[in-house]
Amino acid sequence: MDAITINSLFLVGAVLVAASILLSSFSSRLGIPILVIFLAIGMLAGTDGLGGIAFDNYPAAYLVSNLALAVILLDGGMRTRASSFRVALWPALSLATFGVIITAGLTGLVAAWLFNLDIIQGLLIGAIIGSTDAAAVFSLLGGKGLNERVSATLEIESGSNDPMAVFLTVTLIAMIAAGETSLSWMFLVHLIQQFGLGIIIGLLGGGLLLLLINRMELANGLYPLLAVSGGILVFALVTALNGSGILAVYLCGLLLGNRPIRNRAGILQTFDGLAWLSQIGMFLVLGLLLNPSDLLPIAIPALLLSLWMILFARPLSVFIGLLPFRSFNLRERVFISWVGLRGAVPVILAVFPMMAGLPNANLFFNVAFFVVLVSLLLQGTTLSFAARKAKLVVPPTLAPVSRIGLDIDMNNQWEQFIYQLSCDKWCIGATLRDLKMPQGTRIAALFRGKDLLHPTGSTRLKEGDILCVIGQEHDLPALGKLFSQSPNIQLDERFFGDFILDADAKLQDISQIYGLNLEPTVDKQQTLGQFVLYLFGGEPVIGDQIEWDGLTWTIAEMESDRVSRVGVKIVTDKA
């Protein structure tokens, strides 16, 4: 490869990445998932597109995609709160194991019939497209404001269901290559190996990496590089040992993100850019790999297979997988069924048969790609609509314009939050002493226009003021309410109820006010929060609703695992 060729690659790569970034703004305007934009640009640059770039290097695509997935899952793990495991761990693991098997089996049987294949080859197609994709789920769920039970279940499922899909795919490829038609006891051994190595080495590697980062004295810019290189090392090591590198790197990130770590803010900020670059690069390469003309001959059966999986196989697997978990209501189960997003992982798995030289490998690849496109276009574009119809969107609290980590003490992660006050903020005209700031927070600076003011308690806030507040992450909900907009208060009332009650209120007092019909066995001296927990059972989350005694009770606020405020609304016939 000469210098001119290398420079041409740099030029083409830079143009494609820049075009992806610039055109990503059309995603929200058109209601199209941003991943589809990246895929489309790659396809336009490919053999059948305007660019005419001939790219059929499957090993290179496999390399780029796996590297990108490792970075995306490391970032996703760091941003997943360990508290979400309280409500979602076991349901997500059920979907990640039994759910994938059911989806793959049902989809594979229909694939064998639609494409006139042997049962085992049909099951291979089912295994390839059987898992949801972490990159797609993390990208499309971000900022949707779903209740914690649903969002955490979907995110943990997408980060942990790839081992089952990889295991099924590799096992079926080996069986087809060896001419076998039945499973042996080694099937279970390989499954345990995939999950076991992924969990053990992922957590051990994450712990060692955390220790190394906190012990080493480095330039601030090197900590993110150490974290990402360590995560990739964990991914590669587990994969080399025939474990699930995808699960390992996710758990590694989860451990890093939920323990005190040096330069946390810098690591997260760098990871954000790396994750975006990884998504762009991965979907560009996968788009280049596809020739749209190859999809036309299989379009009808592949579309039927996609609809079968989306409308029947995935919902059935979700309803079976969530049977033991009574805390999920019907609306949540239906929504989780709909968010069976497919993305890069099925396409990467479809490269395996190509590299193994199996018959019909091109068919497997094209079918997988078609299913991914249908999933992103059909499910991805309707995600917000489905969430609203299922009434799973919790009214958001105001987020700061920006947040900057101060990196003063890794055991106390102080940050600077910046809020800009527009005319619709209720606090306009209030004095600083009137603001009920969360305990431990301080207003560090107040900007008015280009001027830095020296405020006192009597300083009144004006439209356009910029407040710099020092606090910690757990202060964000209270700060968001403090600087909230008036319309959000009305939205909260529509969602949470006509009245928002303090959960510490005595049940006896609430009973007298609302005329509740309490059973004689009910302890009237308990608090409203304790009684609501009894009504819900399980692990409640903000937005959970239940009808009792002619009233709708909604959990409006929680502090850690404790219900702090409850919304009450009178049940009407219309509702």
UniProtKB/Swiss-Prot annotation:
It comes from the Bacteria. It is a multi-pass membrane protein. Residues 403-485 form the RCK C-terminal domain. GO terms for biological process: cell volume homeostasis. PROSITE patterns: RCK_C. The keyword Transmembrane helix applies. It holds the Pfam family Na_H_Exchanger. One of its GO terms (molecular function) is potassium:proton antiporter activity. The chain crosses the membrane at residues 3-23, 30-50, 58-78, 95-115, 122-142, 172-192, 194-214, 221-241, 244-261, 270-290, 293-313, 334-354, 363-383. It is found in: Cell inner membrane. Its main location: membrane. InterPro entries: Cation/H_exchanger_TM, FAD-bd_PCMH-like_sf, FAD-bd_PCMH_sub2, Na+/solute_symporter_sf, NhaP2, RCK_C, RCK_C_sf, Transptr-assoc_dom. The keyword Lipid biosynthesis does not apply. It catalyses: K(+)(in) + H(+)(out) = K(+)(out) + H(+)(in). Belongs to the monovalent cation:proton antiporter 1 (CPA1) transporter (TC 2.A.36) family. NhaP2 subfamily. NCBIfam families: PRK05326.1-1, PRK05326.1-2, PRK05326.1-3. This is K(+)/H(+) antiporter NhaP2. It comes from Yersinia pseudotuberculosis serotype IB (strain PB1/+).
